[in-house]
Amino acid sequence: MDKDIKAIIILLATQAMINMGEIQDPITHEAKDDLDGAAVFIELLDILESKTQGNLTTEEEAFLIEVRENLDQVYNKKISAG
């Protein structure tokens, strides 16, 4: 797998998880509760997926889809919890 694309996916997913409070902010060491912020990073992953369609290896595409699905589950759970 190309480390560059994986690094971008991980970077965006990590920021989404930080904004959803699933990972502590590495600077403040506090859990955030910013679902709007998380949505921005999730949307960026959607853009990445659409712009790279047909140009990713099978492994890269599967990784991106898995990360997106996991983020969707966490995001929807947070939204439902209110």
Where are these regions (language model features)?
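N-terminal intrinsically disordered, cationic/polar leader segments
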Residues: M1-I47, T58-G82
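Acidic, glycine-enriched active-site microenvironments
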Residues: T52
